[in-house]
Amino acid sequence: MILSDEKCDFLESIASFLGPKDVELVFVDSKEMQEINLEQRKQDKTTDVLSFPLENIDESLPLGSVVINVDLAKEKAKELGHSYEEEISLLFIHAMLHLLGFDHENDNGEMREKEKELIEYFNLPKSLIVRTLG
């Protein structure tokens, strides 16, 4: 189940498919995202999505938190010619894979391949990352 103040029913099927644990979902603007990115990652710039896994000390705790930049999601959706909800779904999949332990910076393409499989399964448009894979 997704824990969020925003209505995001369209993401529930993705969250349920990827696991039984709850996930906190937060929507922010570009300025807020830049502040979070600076505080958490020492990067003084905005970004589209961040994920923060929680230590699995207690099974009742959520898997972690996903923070999505709505400003960049709207821009990217317009640029790539798909809906805002589709872009949010693409970002959510990417972040969920990070929460599940995938890391595209250190693996041999496993995360990208899993992301591609999920995008196809949920009949979403290809993300920019998947488009660059060929």
Curated annotation (Swiss-Prot):
Binding residue positions for Zn(2+): 94, 98, 104
Any one GO molecular function term: metalloendopeptidase activity
Subcellular location: Cytoplasm
A Pfam family: YbeY
EC number: 3.1.-.-
Family: Belongs to the endoribonuclease YbeY family.
Protein name, as recorded: Endoribonuclease YbeY
Source species: Campylobacter jejuni subsp. jejuni serotype O:23/36 (strain 81-176)
